[in-house]
Amino acid sequence: LRNECSRFFMCFPAGYKVTNSDVEQILSHNREESAFTMFDAMLESLPPAKRLENSLSILQKILLSKKDNSPVVIIAGLVSCFRRLSMWQTIHSQGHIPSDIELKSNGFSSKTAQRQYAKAAKLWTPGHVAAILALLAKTDLEIRSTGSLFQENQLTLMLYEIILKNGAYCARYETD
């Protein structure tokens, strides 16, 4: 606790009275981000442009961190989330309401996960999820084949296509 509280001394001048909002602001900036927190940001009850902005902010934090900042790790985490969403949609297909035992046996034991995937299922249809999984595979292949030169741009475009276009690829303008 002493170690954690000592961070506040570096953030504020001597004699400053730290408020709850100050603590929240410091802790939110020190929170460790991952593909899973990015998935949560994609689900927020905000307009798509704001969800994209928040997801891009998390992407920047991940890329600047020393731990798990590889695009392959980021994409793998998102693939895991969208595969679980696909499983959730399959369990709930055709109006079927699964029991708690059925949900737990499929990996949705916590109420938080159940709320998260119920919210995601309202945002993306099974068709969208299939398109997003294909997009994630395409982006992974492109990043592995082109190297690190354009990886940030490719990840940014991928997030745009997931959040604003529901997995549809951006059209390319071609001239003769």
Regions from the language model: what does each represent?
Residues 1-13:
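Conserved AAA+ ATPase small/helical "lid" subdomain
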Residues 10-21, 25-27, 34-176:
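C-terminal alpha-helical interaction modules of replication/initiation AAA+ assemblies
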